[in-house]
A protein has these predicted regions:
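One-carbon transfer enzymes
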Residues: 1-176
Length: 176
């Protein structure tokens, strides 16, 4: 039985994980939803085949990244908008469309091989955007679980980087 460790605390990530647990037969799915629950020793003891880090903001140790198949979801069309606060940074830059990218984690931030990428609109409320992220994240994850791939390397020459915005910097008021 395949063991899948799902790590994340955001509602949209937890919704993806719950759907995977319900719909992916033949898997032992464990969900970790707080920083206090997650540790390298927990990962070693559980010994998962795959770790999903969706909606997770803390640094993951090199020992976990190097010894397990770790997949991350990033709400941009990587390699664009690597780094923190991708949604806020895209909206501030005037982007109308974004994407959901699933990729294998590597030692470099948001730079691993892409296993799924699909465009999504940034229109509507933040809840509308989170709903799209959830839908595409689930779609991409199930696609990967059913037909694993090694992924496609990112085009480094197209990479852009952004810093995480503070809570105050992340409050965005859009004008009609």
């Amino acid at each position: 039985m395949k063991k899948i460790l799902c790590v994340g605390y955001r509602d949209w990530a937890l919704n993806i994980y719950k759907k995977i647990a319900k719909n992916y037969n033949g898997a032992d799915v464990t969900i970790v939803s707080s920083h206090d629950e997650y540790s390298d020793s927990f990962v070693r003891n559980y010994n998962p085949d795959i770790i999903l880090f969706y909606g997770w903001s803390w640094i993951i140790s090199n020992s976990v990244v190097n010894n397990y198949k770790c997949i991350m979801l990033h709400p941009s069309k990587l390699p664009k908008y690597r780094g923190g606060s991708p949604l806020q940074n895209q909206i501030i830059k005037g982007e109308k469309d974004s994407g959901v990218t699933l990729f294998f984690m590597s030692a470099r931030m948001d730079a691993g091989p892409i296993i799924f990428q699909e465009t999504m609109s940034l229109s509507g409320s933040i809840d509308d955007i989170f709903e799209r992220i959830e839908e595409l994240g689930y779609k991409g994850t199930m696609q990967f679980l059913k037909s694993p791939t090694k992924g496609v390397e990112q085009a480094e020459e197209d990479a852009t980087y952004y810093k995480r915005r503070t809570k105050d910097q992340s409050e965005i008021t859009l004008k009609e």
